[in-house]
């Protein structure tokens, strides 16, 4: 109720300014103990060797540097993913680079992996009180040639490994030049081979196995999805996140800002993202879990992702448009389904 009253004021501000103000307010409320969500009664679920208290996660992109983990955790998330982080700090693309399309409950962004670098993120993670499941989403610096991208991923993998519950390899942002080339079969085969080899070395070194996931785009043809699924299984990748933002403007073509460059998230992405989840589920046959994300604006949207084959879901734009209560709303519905558990894909 409070968020619905405040939203018009927040939306009157430039989006990145509003983002900063919202986080400052959330941090203040958290420090004063003014809010703490009551998690929905839920049977915890073991996926990738991790115990998830509920299936609702925060997607990467909202807290790029891991500066607000404790405050976000108080909203009742079952897991939190921070990043995307790169080896070196970078400012991202010039502003303006974030645009709301409120008529369609959607957002266009061309942020360009603005972040303070992996060392800054790790310092924030080490300072947090949060003891829940934390994903760290890693990417390459904008000026790293795509043929050298593996070097950037390795730097981030090695520095984040000890502190992450799982690590997501972002090869699908549309806002870093040529990044999506890494979804092509030859490039992805090589990248996954190198990352999995180093994952095992790090597991031996630290006595801790940190699952490795890959985040893919929604703008893939069916044969491309099948090819990616085959490579994920070949390299025994631990999970897949579907999907990132889309370059499509279907359904929003006439709206203000629709022609802005960048990736579209929010309600118009829902059907496309769900279809990718369903195709992955068919191709993977339960071999690894899917985290469904893209256009989830309510519990019904989350249920659709689970029905399509996702084991867990993540929200971002829905949180912006619906407010913090969305987390508990979705968790309550999903946790009440099937006696507090979920069906979805493999939970191994």
Curated annotation (Swiss-Prot):
Keywords linked to the UniProt accession: Cell membrane, Flavoprotein, FMN, Membrane, Oxidoreductase, Pyrimidine biosynthesis
Residues involved in FMN binding: 60-64, 84, 137, 170, 215, 243, 266, 295, 316-317
Listed cofactors: FMN
GO cellular component, as recorded: cytoplasm; plasma membrane
Protein EC: 1.3.5.2
Pathways involved: Pyrimidine metabolism; UMP biosynthesis via de novo pathway; orotate from (S)-dihydroorotate (quinone route): step 1/1
Free-text cofactor note: Binds 1 FMN per subunit.
Location of the active site: 173 (nucleophile)
Binding site for substrate: 64, 109-113, 170, 175, 244-245
GO biological process per UniProt: 'de novo' pyrimidine nucleobase biosynthetic process; 'de novo' UMP biosynthetic process
Gene Ontology molecular-function annotations: dihydroorotate dehydrogenase (quinone) activity
Main location: membrane
Catalytic activity: (S)-dihydroorotate + a quinone = orotate + a quinol
Protein localization: Cell membrane
Membrane topology value: Peripheral membrane protein
Subunit note: Monomer.
PANTHER family reported for this sequence: DIHYDROOROTATE DEHYDROGENASE (QUINONE), MITOCHONDRIAL, DIHYDROOROTATE DEHYDROGENASE (QUINONE), MITOCHONDRIAL-RELATED
Record-stated family: Belongs to the dihydroorotate dehydrogenase family. Type 2 subfamily.
The protein's role, per its UniProt record: Catalyzes the conversion of dihydroorotate to orotate with quinone as electron acceptor.
Protein name: Dihydroorotate dehydrogenase (quinone)
């Amino acid at each position: 109720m409070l968020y619905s009253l405040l939203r018009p004021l927040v939306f009157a501000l430039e989006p990145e300014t509003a983002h900063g103000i919202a986080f400052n307010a959330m941090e203040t409320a958290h420090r004063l103990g003014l809010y703490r969500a009551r998690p929905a009664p839920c049977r915890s679920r073991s996926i990738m060797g991790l115990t998830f208290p509920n299936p609702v996660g925060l997607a990467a992109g909202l807290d790029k540097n891991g500066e607000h983990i404790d405050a976000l955790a108080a909203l009742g998330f079952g897991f939190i993913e921070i990043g995307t982080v790169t080896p070196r700090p970078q400012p991202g693309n010039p502003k303006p680079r974030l645009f709301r399309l409120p008529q369609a409950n959607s957002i266009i962004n061309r942020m360009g992996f603005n972040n303070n670098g992996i060392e800054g993120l790790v310092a924030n993670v080490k300072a947090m009180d949060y003891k829940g499941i934390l994903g760290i989403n890693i990417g390459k610096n904008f000026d790293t040639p795509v043929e050298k991208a593996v070097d950037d991923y390795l730097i981030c993998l090695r520095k984040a490994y000890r502190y992450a519950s799982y690590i997501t390899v972002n090869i699908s942002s549309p806002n870093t030049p040529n990044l999506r080339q890494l979804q092509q079969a030859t490039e992805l085969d090589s990248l996954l081979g190198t990352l999995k080899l180093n994952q095992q070395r790090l597991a031996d070194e630290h006595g801790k196995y940190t699952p490795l996931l890959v985040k893919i785009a929604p703008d893939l043809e069916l044969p491309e999805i099948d090819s990616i699924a085959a490579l994920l299984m070949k390299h025994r990748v631990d999970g897949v996140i579907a999907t990132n933002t889309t370059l499509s403007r279907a359904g929003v073509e006439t709206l203000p800002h629709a022609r802005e460059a960048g990736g579209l998230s929010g309600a118009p992405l829902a059907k496309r993202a769900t279809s990718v989840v369903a195709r992955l589920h068919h191709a993977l046959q339960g071999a690894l879990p899917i985290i469904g994300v893209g256009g989830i604006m309510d519990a019904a949207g989350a249920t659709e992702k689970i029905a399509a084959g996702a084991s867990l879901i993540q929200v971002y734009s829905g949180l912006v448009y619906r407010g913090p209560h969305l987390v508990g709303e979705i968790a309550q519905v999903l946790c009440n389904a099937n006696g507090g558990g979920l069906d979805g894909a493999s939970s191994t």
